[in-house]
A protein has these predicted regions:
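A polyanion-binding, active-site-adjacent surface
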Residues: 2-218
Length: 218
């Protein structure tokens, strides 16, 4: 682990690696003002939860760091863990197609996950894991400063919005995350299994486009 990360974590009052922690104390905020290189370094060397023991590599995020639209997913899968990039494979291809239909190339948006490491067997992340990782995403959102966020999947939407509402109730309306409009929709992997829901996701994309075009007061 880099000396800079030890300094940052020490300033935060946390150990370099805490394998078990109660969810109530799991959230750790990076110091304000950290830039892209520093946040990327913290993520790359992170040992704040047990996922560091099973990952191949971290998956920081990719795309336009000044994007108007930011896409937030759940966690890396096996292929993402191998390649170090979010949304690859069949789900990634479908996401790319969805974005293209909305007028965006993949490189024009910024794509990141709530979790930067893959949970074993693609299980849902624990409260501890999400609590440790969410501050990284929060800082990424601050740096990108998007005009809208598209949350894809139940876990991404619930973790970002701090709710346990099902995705079927979260989609179709505009939410707020620290002043940024958030639109929730189904995960591309779910749409591959349930193609009949693609129309709803297209409606969600149109909602996001409306926010980008006209703004929205949440």
């Amino acid at each position: 682990m880099q000396a800079r990360q030890f300094e940052v974590l020490a300033a935060l009052g946390v150990d370099a690696y805490v394998p078990r922690v109660r969810a109530a104390s799991a959230r750790v905020e990076p110091p304000p003002g950290l830039g892209w290189d520093e946040i990327a370094g913290l993520v790359r060397e992170c040992r704040l939860c047990g996922l560091c023991e099973t990952r191949t590599q971290t998956v920081f995020g990719t795309g336009n760091r000044r994007a108007r639209l930011m896409v937030v997913g759940e966690a890396p899968g096996a292929e993402e863990d191998r390649q170090g990039e979010p949304f690859v494979g069949r789900a990634g291809m479908l996401l790319n197609a969805m974005l293209r239909a909305a007028g965006f190339e993949r490189g024009e948006v910024f794509i990141a996950n709530v979790l930067k490491c893959r949970p074993p067997n693609n299980r849902d992340p624990s409260d501890e894991e999400a609590g440790r990782c969410l501050p990284y995403l929060r800082r990424q959102i601050e740096l990108v400063a998007p005009a809208a966020i598209l949350c894809v999947g139940r876990i991404a939407a619930q973790r970002l919005l701090g709710t346990d509402e099902p995705i079927g109730r979260l989609r179709g309306r505009v939410h707020d995350f620290d002043g940024v409009p958030v639109i929730a929709t189904y995960h591309p992997a779910y749409l591959l299994r349930s193609p009949g829901e693609k129309r709803k996701s297209w409606d969600d994309l149109k909602l996001a486009l409306g926010v980008l075009a006209h703004g929205h007061s949440t």
